[in-house]
């Protein structure tokens, strides 16, 4: 069994409760440990604390989390009562992180199962487990497809830069932004990856560098402020990142620091690619200005090594810590999805790609 597998699920069996088994990414790269959730509160906390993170992964985790709803199929609970409890769980898990639309997409799929069901209560849980597994399996196929489409754009590159972590740790398999790198690596194509550290939580330095190194893909960590210098030196052939939400016009919400990276890439005439599944698109939002941006604790900036370590900002000084920023579509060379590539995205192209 792969100990680095991001998400596992163990169905209830012989009186043993169902378990959502997560790789604890807050402990990487120093410690490889897992966190087992058996309640919806534990699942909510794991998503909120970034034990599991990455837009596709939190959607999968939330879907499995719905199945942990305490509904006793052997009791006299009526179907309407059970449905009400599942809906309550879905609403609760939706509050764990506000920006990643994959979370709401996965929970909407689970809600549809609850709303449309008309059989025994015990069978409803089975249907929900089946749907969560299907969401997990769909994500694996998405990773393969994005890897294939993205590889065609990076085939002539010798080095690429990426931001945050949009790899296997953020999904069920290869990831989104890192999927083309895995695809090319399997094909024997040598590609160096610059992983910028991604402050304040260092997902690039801690997670992307770790998983690529584990896979044998050459990776070099650089500070966030070093990116422009590397581009000016001609050491970066392309930039590729993931996304947590994409508006109808192609504007992209991704980890804070993505927007300045896109500006730098534009200035240096370097392609800037965004890789994300179609369920990351929010066609109801006309532009990125409408995307809700999660504001996280100031402690993540003031105590970068944890609150038990020395404070790195002066006491009493204000700290701003948005988790995401928005990159305008005009800075995006192409969007890469499991369906293909949207070059120079705009509203018309996005709608056509999504079949709207």
UniProtKB/Swiss-Prot annotation:
EC numbers on record: 5.3.1.23
**Pathway terms, separated by semicolons:** Amino-acid biosynthesis; L-methionine biosynthesis via salvage pathway; L-methionine from S-methyl-5-thio-alpha-D-ribose 1-phosphate: step 1/6
What cystine linkages occur within this chain? none
Residues carrying the site annotation Transition state stabilizer? 164
Reaction equation(s) it catalyzes: 5-(methylsulfanyl)-alpha-D-ribose 1-phosphate = 5-(methylsulfanyl)-D-ribulose 1-phosphate
Please give one Pfam family short name. IF-2B
Catalytic residues?
244 (proton donor)
Alphabetically list the UniProt keywords: Amino-acid biosynthesis, Isomerase, Methionine biosynthesis
Q: Where does substrate bind?
A: 53-55, 97, 203, 254-255
Example GO biological process:
L-methionine salvage from methylthioadenosine
> Which InterPro entries does UniProt cross-reference here?
IF-2B-related, IF-M1Pi, IF_2B-like_C, Initiation_fac_2B_a/b/d, M1Pi_N, NagB/RpiA_transferase-like
Its family remark reads:
Belongs to the eIF-2B alpha/beta/delta subunits family. MtnA subfamily.
Q: What does this protein do?
A: Catalyzes the interconversion of methylthioribose-1-phosphate (MTR-1-P) into methylthioribulose-1-phosphate (MTRu-1-P).
What name does this protein carry?
A: Methylthioribose-1-phosphate isomerase
Source organism per entry reads: Rhodopirellula baltica (strain DSM 10527 / NCIMB 13988 / SH1)
The uppermost taxa in this organism's lineage are:
Bacteria, Pseudomonadati, Planctomycetota, Planctomycetia, Pirellulales
Q: Which gene encodes it?
A: mtnA
